[in-house]
From Swiss-Prot:
Highest taxon of the lineage: Bacteria
Keywords associated with the record: Cytoplasm, Endonuclease, Hydrolase, Metal-binding, Nuclease, Ribosome biogenesis, rRNA processing, Zinc
Gene from which this protein is expressed: ybeY
Chain's role: Single strand-specific metallo-endoribonuclease involved in late-stage 70S ribosome quality control and in maturation of the 3' terminus of the 16S rRNA.
GO biological process, one term: rRNA processing
Chain sites annotated for binding Zn(2+): 116, 120, 126
Enzyme nomenclature, EC number: 3.1.-.-
Family indicated by similarity: Belongs to the endoribonuclease YbeY family.
Name of the protein this chain belongs to: Endoribonuclease YbeY
GO cellular component: cytoplasm
Cofactor requirement: Zn(2+)
Organism name: Renibacterium salmoninarum (strain ATCC 33209 / DSM 20767 / JCM 11484 / NBRC 15589 / NCIMB 2235)
Pfam families the record matches: YbeY
InterPro entries cross-referenced by the UniProt entry: MetalPrtase_cat_dom_sf_prd, YbeY, YbeY_CS
Co-factor remark: Binds 1 zinc ion.
Length: 157
């Protein structure tokens, strides 16, 4: 499993934990061992540009996902094929604001956003109530299992 973190934010962050979480999610969702993922930690200005360019919305957001190969979770008997999962872009400054609002640590928020971004790359969405319940339920389940305690509550920018 190849997980690359590129920290362009200028903020020191727990990059190794993001890699460890990503590998954990890969295993839990039966992704091929040669699956590739890139996590980019961007400053507020860069994230705002991406948000406007790709989502046509002003202001920085917390996380954006850019899928490459259309990979989906596998099963025990049928793991997902190898491929390039895509890029997750996270804005640590927005994550810090959300962590404060949510009453949890910045590290917990970064782990939450990484999980959220991974699930988007795997085809999950939260546009309607059923999709949201499925995605957020899986997100909580994965994070709770990874952390060995309750996952932090979801926050929004």
């Amino acid at each position: 499993m190849s997980v690359e973190v590129n920290n362009e934010s200028g903020v020191e962050l727990p990059e190794a934990e993001l890699v460890r979480l990503s590998r954990f999610v890969f295993e839990k969702l039966y992704l091929h061992p040669q699956t590739e993922l890139s996590i980019i930690l961007a400053d507020r200005e860069a994230m705002e540009k991406l948000h406007v360019e790709w989502m046509y919305e002003p202001g920085a957001t917390d996380v954006l996902s850019f899928p490459m190969d259309e990979l989906r979770p596998g099963t025990v008997s049928r793991p997902a094929p190898a491929g390039l999962l895509g890029d997750i872009v996270i804005c640590p400054q927005v994550a810090q604001e959300q962590a404060q609002a949510g009453g949890h640590s910045v590290e917990d928020e970064l782990l939450l956003l990484t999980t959220h971004g991974l699930l988007h790359l795997l085809g999950y969405d939260h546009e309607d109530p059923e999709e949201k319940a499925e995605m957020f339920g899986l997100q909580r389940e994965l994070l709770t299992s990874f952390l060995g305690r309750d996952a932090p509550a979801e926050t929004t920018a």
